[in-house]
Amino acid sequence: MNITDRRRMLRRTEYYNPTITSSADDMSARMCKILKSLRSGDRSTVVLCIGTDRATGDALGPLVGSLLSNSQCAYRVYGTLQHPVHALNLNDTIKKIYTEHQYPVVIAVDASLGHRTDVGMVTLTKACLLYTSPS
């Protein structure tokens, strides 16, 4: 297998249908497996919830962020209804995350546009958030 094929496998998007009872368990198990493979040493895990309630269909991230914050989530949460992370402050928030956390594992939560057949699906992808350190 060449490097390009390996990268494609690592970035494979998995789809979960929330109307199927076993999907939550399947996605949880997969996410735990991914987190275990990424967490080494003292790497912290943060949850980056992207979106705004000011745009129709874009409130998933801040809604999840608010729910996690109110449930005393073990991970640091960025992006809530009160303090949303959106297009205008996303880059600054990512810089802040990488400044406050050394080599963090970032779980990003965001609504997305996609194919009609994917409406309502929850996706999980092991991929990188793009961040370029200022020179």
Which stretches of residues belong to each language-model region?
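Conserved small/polar residues in nucleotide/adenosyl-binding loops
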Residues: Y131-S135
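N-terminal catalytic or cofactor-binding beta/alpha core of small enzyme domains
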Residues: N2-V106, A111-L130
